[in-house]
Amino acid sequence: MTKSETTLSKLLVESELVQECEELLSSLPRDRSVFAEYLYQYQGFWYPPNLLEGVLYSQKHFQARDSDIVLASIPKSGTTWLKSLVFALIHRQEFQTPLVSHPLLDNNPHTLVTFIEGFHLHTQDTSPRIFSTHIPVGSLPESVKDSSCKVVYCCRNPKDAFVSLWHFMKNLIVKEMVGCTMEEMVRFFCRGSSIYGPFWDHVLQYWKESRENPKKVMFVMYEEMREQPQEWVMRIAEFLGYSFTEEEIENGVLEDIIKLCSLENLSKLEVNEKGKLLNGMETKAFFRKGEIGGWRDTLTPLLAEEIDKTTKEKLIGSDFRFFC
């Protein structure tokens, strides 16, 4: 197929998908939100129309391979950092120390590891292919569920994830956010009406899947990774079948990867300070503090209590607990 034929095919697929999504929206529950004019509930989770199109696209067209790696999370839970770490550990033989020409120095992690719900034809030829997703586990494409591909899910404390989402949406200057108070956004967040929400359902379903199918899904906590990066990068590498050798560890390969992928280092790179993604989004929007417990600088005690109350209610009957 020629390049022009491929482009035409892609446009036809997208056109059909937009029409299908418009027809579907009329039958779905909807809720006003600060994240978009309306969010629509599909398979138990809430999406603005453009993100729902991406979910439908992936469900219809994404074909997973047994060697694929899928990095999953709900937004603002360490996605960017996880992408950089996994990309670096998988490709460490190609880009060895000194890391003076590593792709992460000139490319944002979201450029190197794309979303399966993105509008592209998933034509990566390299193996393993690395993708990311915010799609809930129950809505993943059937090919992901049926194949032997590996899924790594990153979870973050809901208060820190909320604050990160708040700043992210403000930076994007989403029109629905104009004049929105944090109190309003907390209310939407706690009732589940946020992008890919309810937050707690998203986390718990992946956690349950990781316990029922531990060879398929690995569940990691952002906070534990921040506190013990070497241990968790080694665990992830082992889960994916790319364990570090003793020689690599002695030669500082693991340490170099962690330094390269640190949020402090990535945020200072020109590509992440001044760059833009293909959709026009500024790359600097993906980097803030990334601190554990940073919510204390933003949330009032009452708002923190409201999120904690929802968390307690959502975890009834489960032995899962968030970090801090």
UniProtKB/Swiss-Prot annotation:
Keyword Transferase: yes
An example molecular function term from Gene Ontology annotations: sulfotransferase activity
Gene Ontology biological process terms in this record: flavonoid metabolic process
Enzyme Commission numbers on file: 2.8.2.-
Catalytic residues, chain numbering: H134
Effect of disrupting the coding gene: No effect on sensitivity to salicylic acid.
Main location: cytoplasm
One Gene Ontology term, aspect cellular component: cytoplasm
Domain of life, per lineage: Eukaryota
Enzyme class, broadest EC rank: transferase
Keyword Signal recorded: no
Binding positions (3'-phosphoadenylyl sulfate): K76, S77, G78, T79, T80, W81, R156, S164, Y222, R288, K289, G290
Listed transmembrane segments: none
Compartments where found: Cytoplasm
Keywords for this protein: Cytoplasm, Transferase
Family statement: Belongs to the sulfotransferase 1 family.
Function of the protein: Sulfotransferase that utilizes 3'-phospho-5'-adenylyl sulfate (PAPS) as sulfonate donor.
Protein name listed in UniProt: Cytosolic sulfotransferase 13
Species per Swiss-Prot/TrEMBL record: Arabidopsis thaliana
